[in-house]
Amino acid sequence: MSEVTTNEYNEDGKMIRKIRSFVRREGRLTKGQENAMNECWPTMGIDYKAELLDWKEVFGNDNPVVLEIGFGMGASLVEMAKNAPEKNFIGIEVHSPGVGACLADAREAGITNLRVMCHDAVEVFEHMIPNGSLATLQLFFPDPWHKKRHHKRRIVQLEFAEMVRQKLILNEGIFHMATDWENYAEHMIEIMNQAPGFDNIAEEGDFIPRPEERPLTKFEARGHRLGHGVWDIKFKRTA
């Protein structure tokens, strides 16, 4: 995933703000991934267009919508969609081989409640996701930018939290984060505690046990065997 910074200007040409985002990184598709992209994109892919999506039109029903940013190769997202047919899932990933792999797995699993996008997540949120429409926003194992001088590049910042808040359903919507970097977990808690309109739903302390709905990945299982921790965090939109 690559990061870019663009400037936004007003009509007078004065810069209003800097926008940091994460954009599509091209990679080499395998033949299987390319085949899945070609075959499945017409039914499961959503092209970027600066217009708000209508979830009923997208999925053909009014089921709750779960959106994941940065699903990697998509195995856990496909598993979640397969295990919860009563929900609709949409994944945004900038790495095209990951999108192809996800579509291939989804086709093999025979699921119909999953859609994917290959575009900048911030642009999608700003122009395509209706306010107050998401039941859950998932952000699993984002780049930790572990060097201190790079912490400002972490996706979880106050402006990102506010963007998420606007898209979640009031008094219901959940922002679910997971990381295997303790320092990033602490950073997430610090940011979310400052972000207005959110409450941590952990019963004790700041973190929750891994929820059953989040599949245990091979990478995570290996980390457990090596003694590495994983921190799950859930905040609910309250205002």
Curated annotation (Swiss-Prot):
Transmembrane helix is among the record's keywords: no
Binding site for substrate: 147, 180, 217-220
Record-linked PROSITE patterns: SAM_MT_TRMB (PS51625)
Enzyme nomenclature, EC number: 2.1.1.33
Pathway linked to the protein: tRNA modification; N(7)-methylguanine-tRNA biosynthesis
Recorded catalytic activity of this chain's protein: guanosine(46) in tRNA + S-adenosyl-L-methionine = N(7)-methylguanosine(46) in tRNA + S-adenosyl-L-homocysteine
GO cellular component terms attached to this protein's record: tRNA methyltransferase complex
Protein name: tRNA (guanine-N(7)-)-methyltransferase
Organism: Vibrio campbellii (strain ATCC BAA-1116)
Taxonomic classification: Bacteria, Pseudomonadati, Pseudomonadota, Gammaproteobacteria, Vibrionales
Gene behind this protein: trmB
